[in-house]
Regions:
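A generic hydrophobic-segment detector
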Residues: 98-143
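Residues that define the transmembrane beta-barrel architecture of outer-membrane proteins
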Residues: 18-24, 59-65, 79, 104-110, ...
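Membrane-embedded beta-strand positions of outer-membrane beta-barrel proteins
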Residues: 26-28, 38-40, 67-69, 83-85, ...
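Residue-level signature of outer-membrane beta-barrel architecture
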Residues: 30, 71-73, 116-118, 134, ...
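Repeated loop/turn-to-beta-strand initiation elements of outer-membrane beta-barrel proteins
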Residues: 34-40, 77-81, 118-126
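Detector for outer-membrane/organellar transmembrane beta-barrel domains
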Residues: 3, 45, 56-57, 63-66, ...
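Short glycine/proline- and aromatic-enriched beta-strand/turn motifs that initiate or cap beta-hairpins
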Residues: 1-34, 38, 42-46, 87-95, ...
Length: 159
C-alpha cells in the first residue's frame, strides 16, 4: 500500500490530505555484476483524498515509470539486501473535489528504495520493500511536491 504523509495546499484555502491506498507495481533489473544492475519500475496508485478535512468522492489516481541503478548484496545463503535510486515520470489523472477540480498533470519524479529478499528456492524469492518517491505537485501553480511512501511484499523471480 502507498501513503502520502502530511497535508498539501495546492490553492489558497484548499488544504489537501492524501490517505493510504492500494499500489500495484512491476519492476525488474538486469545485473551486470552480482552487486550492481540497471532496471525500472512501473506503478499505479490510488489515494483517497480529503479537502479541508472532508473526505471526497473521487480519488487521486497516479501512474509512474522510473529507471535507474539497482544494488544487491547477499548477507547469507538465503537473504539479500537491496537498494535503488530511480528517476522518471509521474502522471496524475483528473480528480474532482468539492472545492476545485484537479486537472491531469505529469512531471519529473525521483525515488529510492530499500528491500530484503528471502530466497525460498534458487530462483524464487519473497521480497519486503519500502520505497520513497518525490512526485511533482498536483497542480502546476504549486511548488509542493508529493512525498509518497510505499510498503510492499512481492514474490520475485531470481536468476
Amino acid at each position: 500500500f502507498s501513503t502520502v504523509p502530511g497535508s498539501y495546499t495546492p490553492y489558497p484555502g484548499m488544504h489537501m490530505q492524501f490517505l493510504s491506498g492500494p499500489a500495484v507495481s512491476v519492476q525488474g533489473a538486469w545485473f551486470a555484476t552480482p552487486y550492481w544492475g540497471f532496471g525500472g519500475r512501473m506503478s499505479c496508485t490510488n489515494l483517497r483524498v480529503k479537502v479541508n478535512g472532508v473526505a471526497q468522492n473521487d480519488n487521486l489516481e497516479c501512474a509512474s515509470m522510473y529507471a535507474g541503478p539497482y544494488f544487491s548484496h547477499p548477507f547469507s545463503m538465503r537473504w539479500l539486501v537491496g537498494a535503488k535510486l530511480l528517476g522518471g515520470c509521474e502522471i496524475y489523472k483528473p480528480c474532482r473535489t468539492d472545492f476545485r477540480r484537479l486537472e491531469r498533470r505529469a512531471g519529473f519524479s525521483f525515488g529510492t528504495g530499500l528491500s530484503t529478499t528471502y530466497l525460498a528456492t534458487q530462483n524464487l524469492g519473497v521480497r519486503f520493500s519500502t520505497d520513497y518517491d518525490v512526485a511533482p505537485p498536483v497542480v502546476r501553480s504549486s511548488r509542493e511536491r508529493l512525498h509518497k511512501l510505499t510498503f510492499g511484499m512481492e514474490v520475485c523471480a531470481v536468476f
